[in-house]
Amino acid sequence: MLSLQSEIDSLCAVSHELLHLGLDGEPIYSDRFRQLNTDVYHRCEHLFGSHGRTLEEEASLCIALLTGYNATIYNPGDKEVKIQSVLNRSLDLLDTLPVSLLRCRLLVACYAEVFDEELAAEAHAIIDGWKDRELTREEFEIVEHLKSLEENQYPCSEVD
């Protein structure tokens, strides 16, 4: 049996693969797309009722679930309710989670769902604290992800 952290890491890896499918110029095959969507969805469903043993593990779990549900196209009808439940858990965590990369990642994961400018502003405040040094790979990735979300708010855009 895998540890909760191993399952979280696995969900993150598969979600990342699904979200970046085809961005490398390789063709997207429908069977691989379906397989990744199914895998991400089932992993999210498996982990949905879980809770981290520590504040950090719970934050990592919420990030993984929000990312996974965001990545998959599957919705048997209760996906929005589950996303809202994870958002509620995340907002409770943000009340106690210290300023850190993990907090920034959770803020951005929540922002990706609701596009609340206060979440983005708080993430930017954390990022601004990194300006006087070279960014780690993870910091660079979260900066780029937030930038991409702010530039492409498709789910919150109205089509004329």
Set out the residue ranges of the language-model regions.
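Amphipathic alpha-helical repeat scaffolds of TPR domains
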Residues: 2-27, 51-73, 98-114, 140-152
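Extended ligand-binding groove/face enriched in aromatic
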Residues: 101, 122, 136
